[in-house]
Amino acid sequence: MIPPKPGKTKQAPRRSKTALASISEVSRMPVARWLQLQQSVHDLLIAEEADGFVANLDAIHAEIDLQMRHHADATLTTLIYLGATEINLYSATHSVLVGAVCALVAGQTLAWSASDCDAVAKAALSMNIEMTALQDHLARQSLRPSAEQQRLIDLHCVLGADLLAEFGVKDKLWLDAVRHHHDKTPGPLAAREPFSRLARLIERVDVYAARMAPREGRSPLPPEMAMSSCRLDENGQIDEAGQAVIDTLGKYPPGSAVRLSNGESGIVVSRSVSAEAPKVVALIGADGKALPSPTLRDTGLKQFRVLQSTAHGSLGGAANLEKILRLI
């Protein structure tokens, strides 16, 4: 994980999980495993039986959490890239991304307790349990939601929390965060009830992830532009939770597609102390043709500085995510 940003990032409390392996013993999860994990999340959220729900969700959370601890930038690269390009299993892809980012922001920047970090991640993973199938359908629907679809959207927070309780979730903080994750309530985090702090962070990351995601009939925003949508609150003021997301992920989050000053385009793969200078794997040359092989660029150097975000579609078929991740 990158060093804390001076003046912005607080030191998160360390967890006493002695069972965790050392950094050298924890391998980066292959992209294929992430796709399997998203399928597991999908299957869990559409299941009609409560048997094993909490244990299975805990296991999924633990696997994601371990990757975020030891391979944060690779995990962000994978999840943000998939979130910006993958329409299959839309709801599960979205929930995994939101949960991972919420936990990282909560621990690294907001310095929340370990229990709050776990609760916000699990709440985000399970927040759409009452509309997983509907959300997948809407991602491929070019028309606006029907009256019945909108009714289900409006009710899914409350019904989802109730269903989670039926499925064995006992953590009131988790349940209340799900129940209120669509609340539009601006204001500082310190003035909120604990559940409201979690719900606000989920809501901000939810907005970010949704706006960069592909949908039928709507072009996704580049991650940098999607990020700016969570920075201001409903009154047009700087939102504390939204700003924490930006402080954590940087101006150009891992997984973003960017254009460099030398004309190349590629994928951001690592944050740095400077929000303006992430590590980038160049994929497309200035001539618009794929480079012979993915090439790591240090955008802190003038000749490789980031000019702007660009659409992932501009990379064509040049982005082999597994090859890109091997360069981190």
Predicted regions mapped to residue ranges:
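Alpha-helix N-cap and coil->helix boundary residues
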Residues: S115-D116, A133, L173, L221, ...
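Histidine/acidic-rich helix-loop-helix segments that form or flank divalent-metal centers
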Residues: K122-A124, L164-E203, G217-R218, S229-N235, ...
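DG-centered beta-turn motif at the end of beta-strands
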Residues: M127-N128, D206-A209
